[in-house]
Amino acid sequence: MKITSYCLLFSTALLSSIALAEQLTAPLAVQQPYTVRSPNGDRQDPYYWLRDDSRTSPTVLDYLHRENDYANHYASAYQPLTDKLTSEIIGRIKQDDSSVPYTKGDYSYYRRYETGKEYPIYLRKAVNGGTEQVMLDVNELAKGKSYYAVSNWQVSPDQNLIAYLEDDSGRRQYTLKVRDLRSGKDLSDQLSGLSSSLAWAKDSKTLYLVKNDPVTLLSTQVLQHKLGQDPANAKLVYEETDNSFYMAVGNTADDNYVVIYLSSTVSTEMRVQDAGKPASNFQLLAPRQRDFQYSAGHISGRWVISTDW
């Protein structure tokens, strides 16, 4: 019976979409002569004009809007089927679900989803008892936005602040925000154009962030930002010039070091800084070499390295 229902919905949608498509002419991208120069030889690309890294060209945007309008017009007949399938998929998901708590410092941390809400709620509770505290309700943060995601968050060593990275465009270009967990209010500190990793120094005032190139979107710089200072004056502590390497920052499991992680297909590299000395320089743990990959953890005052050598 269910299969028959879907077949009827699909047949109706197909006939309707054909009728709709006949009423609307598909946009046609014009061809403009253009030669792409390359060390491996030149080639012709008549659609090169559609490339706009700034995403601001009125001509390109107008064409893309017409493409989207045509696609939406064509697909609108399938909306009943889309709604039916979406409802069935949602019906198979446990909506009131929580993660297993983990303990760090004086608190247990966990994530919860609530029925009818699309986004997670991040919470904590003191290990010695007390009331549950909402750190971030992503449902509230997402209100009024067509897209919203929190990629990463980290609580400060003094347990009073939470730094989080949000994206409201879908381009994975994140903005740093910092919330005071005592008041529930966000601080004025904001940095944009970031990747999805962050780390704290032990002073609970210094943050490490990865800046993306605004054109290529590749991670290129590690910035050190001190809370309360102008984000424009964030200190550059490392810059990667090899675009084959991905970059991230984090803390060791014992929180004694801040780490810059660098990785490519065939090699890795780690640079470390004493988390209690944010004014010190990052030190190279082991230099990158082709066909050499490693990871390291800091345990009881020494580094333990695992490698594929």
Spans of model-derived segments:
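Bacterial N-terminal signal peptides that target proteins for export
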Residues: 1-8
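Beta-propeller folds
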Residues: 8-13, 19-309
